[in-house]
Amino acid sequence: MTPRLDMIGLVTGDMAASLAFYRRLGLEIPPGSEEQPHVEVTLPGGLRIAWDTEEVVRSMDPEWTRPTGGQRREPAFLCDSPAEVDALYDELTAAGYGGHLKPWDAFWGQRYAVVLDPDGCGVSLFAPSTPPTPSTPSAPSTPSA
């Protein structure tokens, strides 16, 4: 059997603040989840995302400490267009979330930005810099006479 990625787990110091942030990014998280120490949702396509409070993590691993410095993880959200990257970045920073990298046209062909979730972890927002063009099927080749 080949292992497959099934779930991404996030540790949070403030469940309500974290869930509010990810709801703003379009994740459908059931109402009332803020009161739970562990929350899981299944995304379209089957991948699950889960949040655990720091207390839950410490109950499983008493030596766990909150990471400091650098990014340990960075979820990335695909936006529909470069304009949506800019608008979502502006919306989130206006709502008080930290902006880490303002939207810019990255050399790898994306409009790219990074905001900070309530725990200070980076969350990428990106879209192709230019919309993909539909491919035109090539004409069948004909043998030379």
Task: Outline where the language-model segments fall.
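Vicinal oxygen chelate
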Residues: 1-7, 28-82, 86-116, 127-134, ...
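Conserved beta-strand-loop-alpha-helix junction that forms the acyl-donor binding cleft
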Residues: 12-15, 107-108
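Acidic active-site catalytic centers that drive phospho-/nucleotidyl reactions
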Residues: 14, 117-119
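Amphipathic alpha-helical segments
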Residues: 14-29
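Conserved active-site tyrosine of GNAT-family acetyltransferases
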Residues: 18-22, 92, 120
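Short glycine-/small-residue motifs
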Residues: 122-125
